[in-house]
């Protein structure tokens, strides 16, 4: 009888211990659901304070892959050609004159500050269309020999190059090679990245004609802190200058466009994706795609871009919910681990007790 009572008490203790991890997990799930539901319940205002007319030029490339640039000036000439055609359409009344034009990342593979032919080509396009052009260009670092900067440059039709943004987060093994001296000796393929990109130190908030835009280059759209800082520094709309030619005919361009849609909703801002070979698109503040291009085509997208000044809840609280959920997850795992250890120790003690009783 006494043994039965002891056994019954042991079963009850095991049940309460087993419930520990389950309760911790349930609490974590409940908190995650509450945070998610709270986010969905917060309205995102998408009304525009005002709008600007934009044109996004997708000049296209000759071939996908690592050798997309081809010979010097090839990609630049494609974008100049498409912009000159836009200017002709404007002069003929077939297209409304935009307030500004956006070119993609790497639209000029030559530094326009060092190569007169690149400077003249860009200047000719800007003068023809008669409005500022945001030009994506590779620019030699002014002080560090051998380094290059990935920039977005505001090119005025009268004053020429002005404000610029330098990509803050170059891609390892794509735009720079970590431990180049050591790795290049054993991985010869790394020589296809001949120069390292130098990172910028500030956000890309610039006045492009009448619009105060936030420039974000390529995969920087994936980094919460870069996009959030750009909006908080005063960007009224976001521009993602990108070159997806090396990822042609893969899911990457669609993936990046989905990221642009996420950022639009997150920050309540219109997002313009300008790509050398596609996908270029205009995303409304609610995440809907207004216009988009096909890949590996030369195209020009025109649209009225809404500009906003209000900030969203996400802008104001930043990464706090992510940290809270991460801590809840870690604490839940720690609680489950500790409970499991106590359970195993109790099981060993009960086994020893039974052996002594026998």
Language-model features, listed with the residues they occupy:
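Enzyme catalytic cores with a strong preference for nitrogen-chemistry domains
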Residues: 1-358
């Amino acid at each position: 009888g006494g043994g039965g009572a002891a056994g019954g008490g042991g079963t009850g203790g095991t049940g309460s211990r087993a419930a520990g991890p389950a309760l911790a997990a349930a609490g974590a799930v409940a908190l995650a659901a509450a945070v998610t539901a709270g986010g969905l319940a917060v309205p995102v205002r998408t009304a525009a304070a005002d709008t600007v007319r934009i044109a996004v030029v997708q000049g296209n490339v000759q071939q996908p892959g690592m050798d997309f640039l081809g010979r010097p000036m090839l990609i630049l000439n494609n974008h100049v050609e498409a912009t000159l055609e836009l200017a002709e359409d404007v002069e003929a009344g077939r297209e409304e004159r935009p307030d500004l034009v956006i070119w993609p990342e790497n639209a000029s593979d030559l530094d326009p500050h060092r190569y007169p032919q690149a400077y003249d080509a860009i200047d000719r396009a800007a003068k023809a269309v008669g409005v500022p052009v945001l030009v994506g260009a590779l620019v030699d670092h002014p002080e560090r020999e051998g380094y290059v900067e990935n920039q977005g440059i505001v090119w005025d039709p009268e004053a020429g190059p002005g404000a610029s943004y330098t990509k803050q987060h170059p891609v390892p093994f794509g735009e720079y090679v970590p431990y180049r001296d050591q790795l290049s000796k054993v991985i010869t393929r790394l020589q296809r990245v001949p120069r390292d990109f130098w990172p910028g130190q500030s956000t890309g908030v610039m006045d492009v004609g009448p619009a105060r835009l936030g420039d974000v280059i390529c995969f920087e759209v994936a980094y919460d802190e870069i996009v959030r800082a750009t909006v908080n520094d005063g960007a009224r709309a976001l521009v993602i200058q990108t070159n997806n030619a090396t990822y042609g005919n893969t899911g990457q361009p669609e993936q990046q466009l989905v990221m642009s849609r996420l950022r639009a909703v997150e920050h309540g801002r219109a997002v313009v994706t300008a790509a050398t070979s596609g996908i270029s698109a205009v995303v409304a503040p609610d995440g809907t795609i207004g216009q988009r291009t096909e890949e590996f085509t030369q195209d020009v997208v025109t649209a009225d871009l809404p500009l906003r000044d209000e900030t969203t809840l996400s802008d104001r609280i930043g990464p706090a919910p992510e940290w809270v959920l991460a801590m809840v997850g870690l604490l839940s795992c720690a609680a489950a681990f500790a409970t499991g250890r106590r359970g195993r120790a109790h099981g060993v003690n009960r086994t020893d007790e039974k052996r002594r009783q026998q």
